[in-house]
A protein has these predicted regions:
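Alpha-helical transmembrane segments of multi-pass membrane transport and lipid-handling proteins
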Residues: 2-6, 73-74, 97-125, 132, ...
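Signature of the first transmembrane helix
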Residues: 3-9, 21-78, 111, 115, ...
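Interhelical loop/hinge segments that connect adjacent transmembrane helices in multipass membrane
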Residues: 6-18, 131, 157, 185-191, ...
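Membrane-water interface segments that mark the loop-to-transmembrane alpha-helix transition
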Residues: 24-36, 62, 67, 71-119, ...
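Transmembrane helical elements of multi-pass membrane transporters/channels
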Residues: 25-40, 166, 170, 191-211, ...
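Helix-loop junctions and terminal segments of transmembrane helices
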Residues: 73-89, 152, 270-310, 363-368
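Membrane-interface junctions at transmembrane-helix termini in multi-pass inner-membrane proteins
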Residues: 84, 139-162, 293, 350-381, ...
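Hydrophobic transmembrane helix module of multi-pass membrane transport proteins
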Residues: 101-240
Length: 479
């Protein structure tokens, strides 16, 4: 099926080429990601109702463990393409090919490490199950170069559709397995494998088609001149990616060590809803990185960061309200009684979601700036703080302690990213007020306290931000 029939018409003419744009691209990424997460939640409901809690928790740990290993194959290279590609659209496709070749070489030692490590830790499990789980995470990593290619060429909408295709196929296959009463864990892993494979194939096909039709002047930075300089330039992002999985997976690893796979499954259900909401700041981040990377002056950088901050203020009360209402009703309705406590855990995680959303302009500014190692250091601080708090809280308080450990990591990201970036943006007072209000709201919601309604205060900076964005749009039209 052609892109034109789907309504996507990437044009070769330079004046008609799409460029990265924050509101449009984040709208596509967030909008489709909401559908992806909705389908993902349905898939998790199928999983939790068809597999024993122990098997469900085991599958989660297997996928998380392989993802933690193979994310290093990424080497930070697609992030570089996402940052530098908008400056040289005519060279972006060749850059994606180059990244894939480098990643194929990098993957070899990590495949060996994964094979040896998995057979030692889970030697009693079928090799086929381990192989399927490993292949799933490898295919996800292999899809990143072409998805970054699409995004840096202004086609975040097509990137989003490849994700939707993958999740639709996976969830549909999960539904078939549930209907036929299949409860063997390897069949469910195979369904995920098929979805990931189709997601990879679609990303490559559409990325190649869009890349061929893009022309444009400009050249990639000097670090792209050789593989050595390219890998060194991507090293901060590679180290970051090595740390990044622990930001969302560390608590589950600690729970599996100190408690049980059943507790991992309970925390995972709560975290699913949290990760669903986390796609909002991730969508803004994904759209903001090429926009900041394209900024030529400090004034442009501040203007674009300020716009992202305003967007965060607007999304904050919406996320708090709908997150609480939807999850508090959805989890008891969709999951068995074994997972009812996940609502309380989610309310705690909701505070961490808010802090992550508010931190987006600052940590993306670090990522796109001249000192990307600062972003690596930031994530290192987040993981260390989450690990220390997890070691203190999880052995004693279990799943609840894991939730507060996650919030501690988000709080460190919020405050440390602002301190490390040091960019001055408007509404700083409201930023601090919103953070404190969100922390209090998460705690009060988790305890069932009616004072949780103080979260409505976040509507005030949202109103100011709407006025500011309208003013910016009016000035843009006049120009």
């Amino acid at each position: 099926m052609s892109l034109k029939r789907l309504g996507f018409q990437p044009l070769a003419c330079k004046r008609d080429m799409r460029r990265p744009e924050l509101n449009r691209d984040s709208g596509w990424l967030i909008g489709v990601d909401i559908l992806v997460v909705f389908l993902g939640l349905i898939g998790q409901i199928f999983l939790s109702r068809s597999l024993l809690s122990a098997d469900y928790g085991l599958l989660i740990i297997l996928l998380d463990a392989f993802a933690t290993i193979f994310i290093l194959v990424d080497a930070g290279l697609p992030t570089l393409l996402n940052r530098d590609g908008p400056k040289a659209p005519g060279m972006a496709r060749k850059a994606a090919h180059r990244i894939l070749k480098l990643q194929a070489v990098i993957a070899l030692p990590f495949i060996a490490i994964a094979f040896i490590g998995s057979t030692v830790i889970w030697g009693d499990l079928p090799f086929g199950l381990l192989g399927i789980c490993a292949a799933i995470t490898l295919m996800h990593v292999a899809s990143y170069p072409h998805r970054s290619l699409l995004r840096c060429l202004g086609e975040a909408r097509i990137e989003a559709m490849t994700k939707l295709l993958e999740r639709t196929v996976t969830t549909s296959l999960y539904g078939c397995l549930m209907i036929f009463g299949i409860n063997e864990i390897h069949w469910w892993a195979l369904a995920f494998f098929i979805g990931a494979m189709l997601g990879l194939i679609s990303a490559i096909i559409f990325g190649e088609k869009v890349g061929k039709n893009n022309q444009g002047e400009g050249s990639l930075p000097e670090l792209w001149n050789s593989n050595k300089s390219l890998l060194m330039g991507a090293l901060p992002f590679a180290v970051t990616l090595g740390v990044l999985p622990y930001v969302t997976k560390l608590e589950k690893f600690l729970l599996s060590y100190f408690h049980s796979y059943e507790d991992v499954a309970l925390f995972h259900v709560a975290q699913l809803a949290w990760l669903a909401g986390l796609l909002v700041p991730q969508g803004v981040r994904a759209a903001l990185l090429p926009v900041l990377g394209e900024a030529r002056t400090q004034e442009q950088l501040i203007t674009r960061m300020s716009k992202a901050q305003s967007l965060g203020f607007i999304l904050l009360p919406v996320g708090l309200f709908f997150g609480h209402v939807l999850v508090s009703n959805l989890i008891p309705l969709a999951f068995s009684n074994d997972y009812v406590q996940a609502v309380e855990i989610f309310e705690i995680l909701l505070a961490g979601w808010a802090l992550t959303l508010l931190a987006v302009p600052w940590y993306v500014g670090l990522q796109a700036g001249p000192h990307p190692w600062r972003f690596t250091g930031l994530l290192g601080l987040v993981v260390v703080s989450a690990f220390i708090s997890g070691m203190l809280l999880i052995p004693e308080y279990g799943v609840t302690g894991a939730a507060w450990s996650s919030v501690c990591g988000s709080a460190v990201m919020f405050y440390a990213s602002r301190w490390m970036n040091r960019t001055k943006l408007p509404q700083q007072i409201w930023l601090d007020v919103s953070a404190i209000i969100c922390l209090a709201t998460g705690y009060l919601l988790s305890t069932g306290n009616g004072l949780a309604w103080i979260g409505i205060i976040t509507v005030i900076p949202a109103g100011f931000s709407i006025v500011e964005i309208r003013h910016q749009m009016k000035n843009s039209e006049e120009e």
